[in-house]
């Protein structure tokens, strides 16, 4: 029997939950839902995307070590482009500008204050003809 999984909630290692949350809210447009640095964990969200920010004491012995990459799958090239422009205007730390990749993703990358990256993409492989997918290395 297959299980239907809910949305994944990645844990992002940060040096300070409060400072990281401020960046995610003020620059990247997330909402800060709960938590603080004293407790070691905080929750942020934007639409259906939820993430946990955790500091070193919280992660000691059982948490991830950074930096990490979180992939955010958007619904169109236009959404990717619009988000890139919005985050660029907000002075997000752009790691890689938006472009179509040879693996048929339109993507860009930004970093947070601790070097963790959000890799925003749209998979346009399904829009290509079977012949073009084959030539691009994505034969089915």
Residue map of PLM features:
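C-terminal "cap" of GNAT-fold acetyltransferases
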Residues: 2-7, 38-52, 109, 133-140
């Amino acid at each position: 029997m297959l299980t239907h999984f809910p949305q994944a909630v990645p844990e992002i290692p940060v040096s300070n939950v409060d400072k990281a949350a401020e960046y995610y809210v003020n620059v990247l447009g997330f909402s800060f839902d709960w938590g603080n640095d004293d407790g070691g964990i905080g929750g942020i969200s934007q639409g259906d995307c939820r993430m946990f920010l955790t500091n070193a004491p919280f992660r000691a012995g059982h948490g991830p070590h950074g930096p990490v990459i979180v992939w955010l799958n958007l619904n169109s090239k236009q959404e990717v482009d619009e988000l890139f422009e919005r985050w660029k205007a907000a002075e997000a730390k752009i790691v890689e500008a938006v472009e179509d990749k040879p693996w048929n993703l339109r993507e860009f990358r930004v970093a947070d204050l601790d070097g963790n990256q959000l890799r925003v993409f749209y998979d346009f492989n399904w829009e290509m003809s079977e012949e073009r997918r084959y030539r691009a290395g994505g034969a089915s």
